[in-house]
Curated annotation (Swiss-Prot):
Family of the protein in this entry: Belongs to the eukaryotic ribosomal protein eL31 family.
The protein's name in its UniProt record: Large ribosomal subunit protein eL31
Disulfide bonds: none
Modified residues (Phosphoserine): 15, 98
Length: 125
């Protein structure tokens, strides 16, 4: 077991989930849709991308860009790309009556090869 913290050592910091941030990730779709029937592969891949974005960015509201949708569906419903490079942007919700303060926008990043790619923070332009 880890040693117990003393009572007065609590840090009051604000959660990083409330900050606006943009990162690029490589998602291995292949392992996420392994064993899925042919006619459900592309739809499941999009659900898995949505789930990945929800987990990484901590926002229940995830919006997928049309170019990403086209990239997943480019080879048809059965032959989904093995990997895909995406940019996840956590943004403030402009809609006042929305239950969520933030949403995540998932956009497609075309790359020639996936070798030696890391998750990177992207500066807001």
């Amino acid at each position: 077991m880890a040693p117990a913290k003393k009572g007065g050592e609590k840090k009051k910091g604000r959660s990083a989930i409330n900050e606006v941030v943009t990162r690029e990730y490589t998602i291995n779709i292949h392992k996420r849709i392994h064993g899925v029937g042919f006619k459900k592969r592309a739809p499941r891949a999009l659900k898995e991308i949505r789930k990945f974005a929800m987990k990484e960015m901590g926002t229940p509201d995830v919006r997928i860009d049309t170019r990403l949708n086209k990239a997943v569906w480019a080879k048809g419903i059965r032959n989904v790309p093995y990997r895909i490079r995406v940019r996840l942007s956590r943004k403030r919700n402009e809609d006042e009556d929305s239950p969520n303060k933030l949403y995540t926008l998932v956009t497609y990043v075309p790359v020639t090869t996936f070798k030696n790619l890391q998750t990177v923070n992207v500066d807001e332009n």
